[in-house]
Structure formats: C-alpha cells, structure tokens
Amino acid sequence: MINKTAKNTKRLRRAERVRYKLRQTSERPRLVFNKTNRYLTAQIIDDAKGVTLVYATTLEKDFPKHENSKKSKSAATELGKVVADKAKKAGVSQVVLDRSGMVYHGRIAAFADSAREGGLEF
C-alpha cells in the first residue's frame, strides 16, 4: 500500500526544488498550474516583483461549461486557452511552466498544449 503522506511529501519536495530553479530565471514569469479535487487553477507570477499578472480558474462564472466536470481534461484544455488569452491582454508572451511537482501527463499536458496553441511560449 502506498503511503499517501509520503507520496505528497515527495511531490512537494520536487515542487520546491523546481520552483527554486525557476525563480533564478527572473526574465520570464512562472505559469503555475494547480489541480484540486474539484477545480483547476492557473496563474502567471512575476517572481521579481512578487505580483500575480494573470489568474484563471474553472470556478469562474464566465468559464465555458463542460459536460464532465470542472476538473476534466477538456476543462484543462479550455483553461489553457483562457490563460493564453488573458496573458496576451496583459502583454505576456514568454513564460516558464511550473507543474507543482506533478507529472507532465494528462490534464497538465492538455493545459500546456492549449496554452502553447494560444500563443504562450515555454
């Protein structure tokens, strides 16, 4: 049986290690993707200034409706498009993807691919 606490602790350690390396590159803001049990969130953070430039979540009222849920792969694809659109309006074109220690697969890959199609470079 997998110890859930140990699994989450390892993920958090990976996330901190990667975030430390990403913060060293201050010329590009971080695109942070996070998934919860119910929703998906994404934000673009400028670490040099400590400011969130763009924020989007599947919880927003104007987010497109999905037949499955607000945490599905199709919702992640739509979230990537929304974040890319908001980033264009904010004048951000180049970012660094922060996966929060999660594997680049499934919802994260769908989100990243749609954000790239929307015009973000990473």
From Swiss-Prot:
InterPro entries: Ribosomal_uL18_bac-type (IPR004389), Ribosomal_uL18_bac/euk (IPR005484). Part of the 50S ribosomal subunit; part of the 5S rRNA/L5/L18/L25 subcomplex. Contacts the 5S and 23S rRNAs. The keyword Ribosomal protein applies. This is Large ribosomal subunit protein uL18. Keywords: Ribonucleoprotein, Ribosomal protein, RNA-binding, rRNA-binding. The gene is rplR. GO terms for biological process: translation. PANTHER family: 39S RIBOSOMAL PROTEIN L18, MITOCHONDRIAL (PTHR12899), LARGE RIBOSOMAL SUBUNIT PROTEIN UL18M (PTHR12899:SF3). It comes from the Bacteria. CDD domains: Ribosomal_L18_L5e. NCBIfam families: L18_bact (TIGR00060). Belongs to the universal ribosomal protein uL18 family. GO terms for cellular component: cytosolic large ribosomal subunit. One of its GO terms (molecular function) is 5S rRNA binding. It holds the Pfam family Ribosomal_L18p. HAMAP family: Ribosomal_uL18_B. This is one of the proteins that bind and probably mediate the attachment of the 5S RNA into the large ribosomal subunit, where it forms part of the central protuberance.
